[in-house]
Amino acid sequence: VAYFEKMKVKIASICFVGIVLIGLLILRQNLNGVIHKRNTMVCPDTRLEHKDEKNLPLIYGITSTYKRHVQIAELTRLSQTVMHVPMFHWLLTEDAHSKTSLVADFLNQSKLSYTHLFIKNNLTSGIVKDLNTRNNALHWIRKNVQPSTNAIIYFMDDDNTYSLRVFDEIRKTKRGSAWPVGLAGGLLHEGPIECKDGKAVRWNVHWWPQRTVPIDMAGFAVHVNVLFEKPTAEFTDRPDIESVFLESLGFNRDNIEVNYCKDVLAWHTQTKAPVIVE
Amino acid sequence: VAYFEKMKVKIASICFVGIVLIGLLILRQNLNGVIHKRNTMVCPDTRLEHKDEKNLPLIYGITSTYKRHVQIAELTRLSQTVMHVPMFHWLLTEDAHSKTSLVADFLNQSKLSYTHLFIKNNLTSGIVKDLNTRNNALHWIRKNVQPSTNAIIYFMDDDNTYSLRVFDEIRKTKRGSAWPVGLAGGLLHEGPIECKDGKAVRWNVHWWPQRTVPIDMAGFAVHVNVLFEKPTAEFTDRPDIESVFLESLGFNRDNIEVNYCKDVLAWHTQTKAPVIVE
């Protein structure tokens, strides 16, 4: 009997150790989950907060850039904006015959998720300065992104200013959406300024009021689905480049989504060329 | 005997449960520590990384700002820079008769640590546009900061561009330190361009080369201790405002600390005034 009782103690001991180990493993896994969640979520003063970051649609921010004295300053400033944005991939298209080491080194040090593209713009024969670089990014998306991907494209000039709140508007985009842009088209805010049920009921337009969708490049976003539905749509050499591009994707003032048009969330700022003597 | 053996099993059970609970408590506490650490440290893509954030010297970023079309755009962009900087307090001094609701609302929404000051600049009788606003911030520090505080002041114009790395240079400041500034004084980089053992051995200067410390406002930081040693030092209405201020605090080209002078970490960028028709 004593032998069996001793065995019972041993078995009980082994069972306990087993249960304890399993319990510890479960706890560890759960706590790891918490750590992981917190890592991506809890930087309240530094990032946009989202409950479930990985389920957010990806934003492809497309930026054309060209060599000039203020280039790295502009890219530094813009990178500090997009560093706050989760689920963001930066498509930087250089106006150059090959990647410059200046921009390559800058991107490499940035820790951002990015793709460095390059193509030479044709400045002598056109109205729009950065046609090739913009179309290069569209080409890259059509070649490298799955048509079923839940992703949205947004064109971000390197000298513009973007409120972090604009990225929330971008992520609401189902097919194509718009919002007002500050200091554009001769106005304090150009674009939709009154909206109802997701549509614009009033637009603020001064320059070329006949445009189909009168909005600055910083004032719209398009879901990649639409790019695959209209596989040849691209930017053309027109002064109303944004409107013509949106029209070629099937958008007009009535069907473009306008969820928010109260405050300005993006500004068409421009930087002075510095006077350098050396 | 069987009774005692049963008791043994019970005692063993209780002991195991107790040990398990203690183990779980210890594990929980340790993991909490990890979580807490990670919260403040691991946002590698969004913040400067510092091992022990709370022991860092505080940075007082001092920004003069005035009403104009691009004001909120500039403040938005600058706020996105300083949002990445730990242990930072923003002293924003408005050039106004009272706090404007535009700036107050902006700061209130920003989640930053800030103090909103105001004073009217006297634009009609001087060279320097923002003399009163700058001195107002110095006055606030001398009145509200303990002389023993480990804090450093840095003047950040709202249209300039700041690499996040400049804040590492600022925090090295023992009494007063300097670094080169991009696109300033007619040069691609003005200020110390060769340094050795914490001192500048060569300066790059074009405009007014006779200045005692030839550096732009974005190119120096001063420990608050020094402000209390020289309690009357302030900005005066001089074109070489930075140099005269640094001189009044006891600095010259030889005793100002220069730890790093290889890359440009701050740029004197300027924004174009937009053409608005309305």
State what each model feature region is.
Chain A
Residues 57-59, 82-92, 113-115:
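Short loop->beta transition adjacent to catalytic acidic/histidine clusters or analogous donor-positioning motifs
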